[in-house]
């Protein structure tokens, strides 16, 4: 399975090498704008596990960038970490509405599904990540581990 993915990607890269090397950096976001100071502040707060304060900054960031899937993903993450699953579900859905292939939102939404004991839905997100991440990605690996942990009775660390 991995060989086929590797082969397909290799052929694609060879055929489109001029386009690939001029494409620039990749991001989960569909937004090429520079990240706002409010967004950057929110990231720092999230890293410090100050989720309520991060939500305030993320809402500030939405004022000027309401179509940024990364902002909605972090809003979902912050609400999930605060135990506000309905709010988290809304924000993950919004992130995926903007960018259906947002790896972070698919992973974190999958983690939320596991918290809600909806293993089947988490596995659906894992399948989506498997299709998006041709040669694998950390989001796939983390969600897969969390699903395995959930099935064996362990608590996820994500």
Spans of model-derived segments:
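Terminal, low-structured helical/coil segments at or just beyond the last alpha-helical repeat
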Residues: 24-35, 123-158
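Alpha-helical segment of the N-proximal tetratricopeptide repeat
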Residues: 33-64
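Structural marker of alpha-solenoid helical repeat scaffolds
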Residues: 64, 98, 131-135
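Residue-level recognition of tetratricopeptide repeat
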Residues: 68, 102, 136-137
